[in-house]
Amino acid sequence: MSLNYEQNAADEQFARAHKAVSLSDDEESEGQAETTSAPNQEPHVSKSPREYYDEPGGKGNGSGADDQDEPETEAASGAANTHVVAHHYNELKEAGRKDRQKSKIFFMRNFNNWIKSQLINEYMSQIKQNKRMGDALRVLDMCCGKGGDLLKWEKAAISHLICTDIAEVSVEQCQRRYQDILQRSEKSKFANKFTAEFFACDSTLVRLRERYKDPSLQLNLVSCQFAFHYCFESMAQADCMMRNAAECLKPGGFFIATMPDAYEIIRRLRAAGPDARRFGNDVYSIEFDCETDPLPLFGAKYQFHLEGVVDCPEFLVHFPTLVKLGRKYGLQLLKRSTFADYYKENLHHGRHLLQRMSGLESVQPQRCENDEEFAHVSNFQGAQRSRSVGTLSKSEWEAATLYLVCAFKKCKNTWDTNGKPLFEFDD
């Protein structure tokens, strides 16, 4: 059995499942964003949509995925775990900097934050290059949490921000942080002042546009950081989430996200043993609640534990399915990179920011000799054993490299005689 979960894009079983659930009228686009598959080496993915709707979280029959008029009713049928996720994030305590510095994953959190900064900067730069002078710059921070990216939006000189999250407590904390930024900006004539709106709701169940102060507004960028995977509880929820990401994006606008890499998760699960349901290290662990052979396209539920954080149920994101859902709403895949690859791509021009954000731990040579977590540093240092090296511990790196970044572009469209959009994809 292959360890490469990615290659299912052109697998016959995967194609049958997609046709059965009618994800899109555009069957020609299937798998174009992915590499060629080797069907005889793939993990078994359920052929029948009925199988994976019977998995945890899946209750829909798949017949209404193309119905764009009633997403809330469709999505609600598969939302068995949304209240668990909301409770999890509402219960998280807001730790101070001193408490965070004591954590085993202090540097990993900073590293992840740097990844987000690089991703946001990459696509905000492209937007600014193409927009006209004086045009508004509007952003949706979908699943905004406590507002960890507010300073990034301020530095990006945006005009308006929409923040939404499933956890009411998080949205309240986010709004307070925004007010603090506003108060600080009053003291500086150079500070960027941007307007914002906040509301709590589940983006996998609710059409966000109907909650905006101006439902007709057009967005330049939609960002969903470390949260998109929750929508893969069911197809209807994933469809609703992708619609929310794409619906108000201007043509040429971007949807960017970070999420767990299902292919890497499955690779590590297989490496743990033929009957393994759990793997991890000192700072993280993953334990599957569903059958892993065959793997369902939706409802592939696992429990994720991170050091110092309450366990929370999550779902694998089958990436070819994500790409196909995106195309349904006019989103074309531009980028898919693992955190490891994205780090390499951005290190040269992002090194200074990485240092400022304490994204790597400075490790002295003598520590490497006695600490297994930093044994890899000795190999890197070579002859220069007197110099300290910036790195992550082995356990932190293993946790960080469970994730990927991705970016989509909203395509222009015309309309057919039935009033359906015909998107102009580049491929």
From Swiss-Prot:
InterPro entries: mRNA_G-N7_MeTrfase_dom, mRNA_G-N7_MeTrfase_euk, RG7MT1, SAM-dependent_MTases_sf. S-adenosyl-L-methionine binds at residues 116, 143, 165, 202, 225, 230. Its EC number is 2.1.1.56. Residues 103-411 form the mRNA cap 0 methyltransferase domain. The record marks 146, 152, 177, 229, 314, 403 as: mRNA cap binding. It is found in: Nucleus. Residues 44-57 have a biased composition (Basic and acidic residues). Gene3D superfamilies: Vaccinia Virus protein VP39. The keyword RNA-binding applies. The modification Phosphoserine is found at residues 22, 24, 29, 46, 48. SUPFAM superfamilies: S-adenosyl-L-methionine-dependent methyltransferases. GO terms for cellular component: nucleus. Its main location: nucleus. Keywords: Methyltransferase, mRNA capping, mRNA processing, Nucleus, Phosphoprotein, RNA-binding, S-adenosyl-L-methionine, Transferase. GO terms for molecular function: mRNA 5'-cap (guanine-N7-)-methyltransferase activity; RNA binding. MRNA binds at residues 112-113. Pfam families: mRNA_G-N7_MeTrfase. It catalyses: a 5'-end (5'-triphosphoguanosine)-ribonucleoside in mRNA + S-adenosyl-L-methionine = a 5'-end (N(7)-methyl 5'-triphosphoguanosine)-ribonucleoside in mRNA + S-adenosyl-L-homocysteine. Residues 1-79 are annotated as: Disordered. One of its GO terms (biological process) is 7-methylguanosine mRNA capping. Belongs to the class I-like SAM-binding methyltransferase superfamily. mRNA cap 0 methyltransferase family. mRNA-capping methyltransferase that methylates the N7 position of the added guanosine to the 5'-cap structure of mRNAs. Binds RNA containing 5'-terminal GpppC. This is mRNA cap guanine-N(7) methyltransferase. The gene is Rnmt.
